[in-house]
């Protein structure tokens, strides 16, 4: 396992987020376009959680979000952040990371 200096880890801005909008991507069977409230702003992510969660299960969910990921285009949509998940090696299961207790959107994860 490769080690990472604390200074590099500290550059990651992870925050508690609340999913405020979910819709299926029109041109991709396994993608959702998700709006996440991370406190001071709302970020959009394109995520491949369709096999694991329904839109109803995602809506309103409190999650852990990597906020300062470089923007990327996924099937024509901008993804500005990443929802953090635990995933099995074979990809058969993916579970969103959530705070143990309710925390407001925008709280920093350290």
Curated annotation (Swiss-Prot):
The keyword Secreted does not apply. Keywords: RNA-binding, tRNA-binding. CDD domains: tRNA_bind_CsaA (cd02798). Pfam families: tRNA_bind. InterPro entries: NA-bd_OB-fold (IPR012340), tRNA-bd_dom (IPR002547), Tyrosine-tRNA_ligase_regulator (IPR051270). It comes from the Bacteria. GO terms for molecular function: protein homodimerization activity; tRNA binding. The keyword tRNA-binding applies. Residues 8-110 form the tRNA-binding domain. NCBIfam families: PRK10089.1-1. Homodimer. This is tRNA-binding protein YgjH. It comes from Escherichia coli (strain K12).
